[in-house]
Curated annotation (Swiss-Prot):
GO biological process, one term: phospholipid biosynthetic process
Top-rank taxon: Bacteria
Cellular component terms (Gene Ontology): cytoplasm
Biological role stated in the UniProt entry: Catalyzes the reversible formation of acyl-phosphate (acyl-PO(4)) from acyl-[acyl-carrier-protein] (acyl-ACP). This enzyme utilizes acyl-ACP as fatty acyl donor, but not acyl-CoA.
Native organism taxonomy: Bacteria, Pseudomonadati, Campylobacterota, Epsilonproteobacteria, Campylobacterales
Principal cellular location given in the protein's record: cytoplasm
Leading EC class: transferase
Pfam families listed in its UniProt record: FA_synthesis
GO molecular function: phosphate:acyl-[acyl carrier protein] acyltransferase activity
Known pathway: Lipid metabolism; phospholipid metabolism
Protein name per UniProt: Phosphate acyltransferase
EC number, as in UniProt: 2.3.1.274
């Protein structure tokens, strides 16, 4: 059975939504949950029927969301430090944390190490498109990148799309300000030349192409990726709020909205980041799923499912093998 360490107290809303997410996941799939935190607080939240799947790793501190990621290695009593350490010692198969993302990245990179051939790890996230989903990476691990970093991100993204998303030949693109090969800054142009070695590389793509269903993996540096991610979250929230405002304007609008309610629910589910759970940190020697600090129980549940799928896929070995083809 898969063993997953869960940073049980690291999110913005404390332990309650995290534990609720763990319990929801256990009701669907059996796994061993190692809850990292204060067991005196956590134990009363666990129903007797699920106690057999729960273990505890004591941690007396929570890494502050206002803390500096560079201090993560010094604070050995924090929940995220203890969780990553369990993975390093191979006592668990994966870690899920909604705590400080910078601390999670820093600890995972320094304590677990990087995969062979990877110079920097990347955070990958799923974005909704009109057909299914687009994998976007990096979305925050590296604000400044070299062309070789983006090439490695491309390989990791392609393998993830193939092994986890079950896309046999994922269409891979590079984010730029135009589709033409000559477009972009020096980093984009240099990265484009490297990515031409990859058979599934289809060239440059613009920001709008994330949503048209014509690409499966989009590669960029962590600065651009994070801006895109946050902008999309804001746009989605604004659109639904505008719809709500318009519906209230007339009786006919309210009737129309009532008739459209099933469609609106499907649309909201498709565009809701909570449905995707968390973002895998690709390139480290282990499975670390980074969840949004504001994750509710549904997001935590889905992040756990991501961790299970990742752990069962042996994706890290596939990434190393794929990179080996180009480094030989």
């Amino acid at each position: 059975m898969i063993n997953i360490a869960i940073d049980a107290m690291g999110g913005d809303f404390g332990e309650k939504p995290i534990i609720e997410g763990v319990l929801k996941a256990l009701e669907t799939k059996p796994f061993n949950a190692i809850l990292v935190g204060n067991s005196k607080i956590l134990k009363p939240l666990i129903p007797k029927k699920l106690e057999q799947y729960i273990q505890y790793e004591e941690a007396s501190e929570i890494f502050s969301m206002n803390g500096n990621a560079t201090d993560a290695l010094k604070n050995k009593e924090t929940t995220i430090y203890k969780a990553i350490n369990l993975l390093k010692e191979k006592k668990v198969d994966a870690v899920v944390s909604a705590g400080h993302s910078g601390a999670s990245m820093s600890l995972a990179t320094l304590k677990l190490g990087r995969l062979k051939g990877i110079s920097r790890p990347a955070i990958a996230t799923l974005m909704p498109n009109i057909v299914n989903k687009t994998l976007l990476l990096d979305v925050g691990a590296n604000t400044d990148c070299k062309a070789e970093n983006l090439f490695q991100f491309a390989i990791m993204g392609e393998v993830y799309a193939r092994e986890i998303m079950q896309i046999q030949k994922p269409r891979l693109a590079l984010l730029s300000n135009g589709e033409e090969e000559c477009k972009g800054n020096e980093l984009t142009k240099e990265s484009h030349q490297l990515m031409k070695k990859i058979p599934n590389f289809i060239g440059n793509a613009e920001g709008r192409d994330i949503f048209n269903g014509e690409i499966d993996v989009l590669v960029c540096d962590g600065f651009d990726g994070n801006v895109i991610l946050k902008a999309c979250e804001g746009v989605a929230t604004a659109i639904f709020q505008l719809l709500k405002n318009e519906v209230k304007q007339s009786f006919i609008s309210k009737i129309g909205a009532l008739l459209m309610k099933p469609s609106f629910k499907k649309l909201k589910k498709h565009t809701d980041w909570q449905e995707y759970g968390g973002a895998p940190l690709l390139g480290v020697n282990g499975c670390v799923i980074i969840s949004h600090g504001k994750s509710d129980s549904r997001a935590i549940k889905n992040a756990i499912f991501q961790a299970i799928n990742f752990s069962q896929s042996h994706i890290n070995k596939f990434i190393e093998n794929e990179l080996g083809k180009y480094n030989a």
